[in-house]
Amino acid sequence: MDRAAILDEVKRVLRDALQLGRRADALTSQSQLLGTIPELDSMAVVTVITAVEERFGFTVADDDISAETFATLGSLTDFVNEKLGA
């Protein structure tokens, strides 16, 4: 799966997990996540992580997650890409 496809899937995960609806369509790789999307609070981060694990078939360790991971859609996509390549 190439990065563009992963980005689209991560966007779908965010749309579904956070119930963003059509607002998710406007997200780009540079879109800020934490602090910008009101639905993405600390509890929602757990929901998104679980959804990412289920969608992409890997497990995320607590030590793998940082604020930088959720800084932008691109940083979250890069995280998923790295996990898939590991």
Language-model segment annotations:
Residues 1-40, 44-55, 59-86:
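Phosphopantetheine-dependent thiolation modules in NRPS/PKS and related acyl-activating systems
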